[in-house]
């Protein structure tokens, strides 16, 4: 672990700081005084190098942060626009449905004001059939009118529904008596023929 730490430090620190930290301590006095001269001049360059490295690292992190924020903002904007568009579409659909319902309701109330509803059509139909049956049963054409029309214009028929033909006239009691007497005489003749045979 102790050997790895200085390696990491060497990689992290710039070369000027590495030269200063890892310089040999067994230098002579003249050598130290001679080294101080260029060291004082090289300290400015070392600071600039460190600043450049820090600025590069900071700028790279800033660029990454800006990119991440931009991507996040784009995602948020896309989601917000999608939700807003979805809400608008729902509102439009609701408005269209309401308009169609109002149109249908208004047209039904205007056009179907005098007409009966479909549930009430059956009784009106039965009433109509009853009304149709009544004029058929009630005689509009009297026999006197029929006779006069037939005498005046035999080719023309009676207008309107005419009454059914009258039933045959009932036989009078005299006719019934005559028929019974005829039957009696016929029966007596049959009996005489049977007896003679």
UniProtKB/Swiss-Prot annotation:
Comp. bias regions, Pro residues:
162-171
Write the record's keywords in alphabetical order, separated by commas: Glycoprotein, Membrane, Signal, Transmembrane, Transmembrane helix
Q: Which organism is it from?
A: Macaca fascicularis
Q: Which GO terms describe its cellular component?
A: membrane
Would I find Transmembrane among this entry's keywords? yes
State the protein's name.
Answer: Uncharacterized protein C11orf87 homolog
The leader peptide range reads 1-23
InterPro entries with a match to the protein in the record: C11orf87 (IPR037670)
* Spans within the Cytoplasmic topological domain: 83-197
Q: Which domain of life is it from?
A: Eukaryota
Is DNA repair found in the keyword set?
no
Question: Could you list the residue ranges that cross the membrane?
Answer: 62-82
* Residue ranges, annotated region (Disordered): 94-180
- Read off the PANTHER family from this record: CHROMOSOME 11 OPEN READING FRAME 87, SI:DKEY-183I3.9-RELATED
Indicate, by first and last residue, each region the UniProt record lists as having compositional bias (Basic and acidic residues).
Answer: 96-107, 125-136
């Amino acid at each position: 672990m102790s050997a790895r730490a200085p390696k990491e430090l060497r990689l992290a620190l710039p070369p000027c700081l590495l030269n200063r930290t890892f310089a040999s301590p067994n230098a002579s006095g003249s050598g130290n005084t001679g080294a101080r001269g260029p060291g004082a001049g090289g300290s400015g360059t070392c600071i600039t190098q460190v600043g450049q490295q820090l600025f590069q690292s900071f700028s790279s992190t800033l660029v990454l942060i800006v990119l991440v924020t931009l991507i996040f903002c784009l995602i948020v904007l896309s989601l917000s626009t999608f939700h807003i568009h979805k809400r608008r579409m729902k509102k439009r659909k609701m408005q269209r449905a309401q308009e169609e319902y109002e149109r249908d309701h208004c047209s039904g109330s205007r056009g179907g004001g005098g007409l009966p509803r479909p549930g009430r059509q059956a009784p009106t139909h039965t009433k109509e059939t009853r009304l149709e049956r009544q004029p058929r049963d009630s005689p509009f054409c009297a026999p006197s009118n029929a006779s006069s029309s037939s005498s005046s214009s035999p080719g023309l028929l009676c207008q309107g529904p005419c009454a059914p033909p009258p039933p045959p006239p009932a036989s009078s009691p005299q006719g019934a008596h005559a028929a019974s007497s005829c039957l009696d005489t016929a029966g007596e003749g049959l009996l005489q023929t049977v007896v003679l045979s």
